[in-house]
């Protein structure tokens, strides 16, 4: 619990760096499956040559702060910066829209169960991001013990998507939640036996 989501962390670093350095996203990727917290993310950015050293320094400085925040949960977290000769990139406004959008997406536990102590009721995971030319695909997984809470979480993400131009939303593989019956003889017997 509390592990860093590499995609969200990358967006945070880039967003914070944008205050000091102009850059343009060439490509971005991270995560492997939508139901796991991504441990790796990478992004190729184009930076004016005169700002390369500033960008590296700023990213290292910002990463140091994040490393301290996640020292207990992710002690092996690393940042690798290498130079590339790639030149094609999103426009400046598109770059900022993308990193602001990623950073604003909900992620993690949204609500604990009011019925079962210590059990998560509703959560969401930003699991995968991949870019291909001018298209960026983001995969998220929302889960809930409550059907209405699940719908609300999905609709919250859809609403955020509709705030941007040229964004398509696809909902797939929805699994309706089920709840354990509160009164059930078998559960009562198992609970008594377990004590």
Where is each model-derived feature located?
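Short N-terminal secondary-structure initiator segments
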Residues: 75-85, 107, 112-114, 164-187
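Midchain, well-structured core segments that form catalytic/ion-binding scaffolds
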Residues: 1-143
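Conserved hydrophobic residues forming the short capping helix/wall of the S-adenosyl-L-methionine
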Residues: 63-67, 161, 194
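A general structural signal for well-ordered alpha-helical packing
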Residues: 56, 95, 99-102, 123, ...
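Solvent-exposed, well-ordered amphipathic alpha-helical segments
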Residues: 47-56, 162, 168-169, 189
């Amino acid at each position: 619990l509390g592990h860093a989501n590499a995609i969200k962390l990358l967006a945070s670093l880039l967003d914070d760096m944008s205050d000091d350095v102009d850059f343009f996203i060439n490509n971005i990727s991270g995560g492997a499956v939508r139901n796991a917290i991504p441990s790796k993310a990478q992004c190729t950015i184009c930076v004016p040559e005169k700002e390369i050293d500033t960008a590296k320094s700023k990213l290292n400085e910002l990463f140091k702060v994040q490393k301290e925040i996640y020292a207990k949960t992710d002690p092996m977290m690393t940042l690798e910066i290498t130079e590339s000769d790639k030149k094609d990139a999103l426009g400046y406004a598109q770059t900022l829209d993308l990193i602001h959008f990623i950073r604003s997406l909900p992620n993690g536990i949204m609500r604990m169960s009011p019925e079962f102590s210590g059990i998560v009721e509703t959560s969401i995971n930003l699991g995968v991001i991949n870019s291909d030319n001018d298209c960026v695909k983001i995969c998220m997984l929302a889960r809930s013990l409550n059907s209405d809470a699940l719908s609300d979480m999905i609709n919250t993400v859809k609403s955020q998507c509709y705030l941007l131009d040229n964004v398509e939303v696809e909902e797939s593989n929805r699994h309706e939640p089920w709840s354990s019956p509160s009164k059930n003889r078998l559960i009562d017997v198992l609970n008594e036996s377990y004590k």
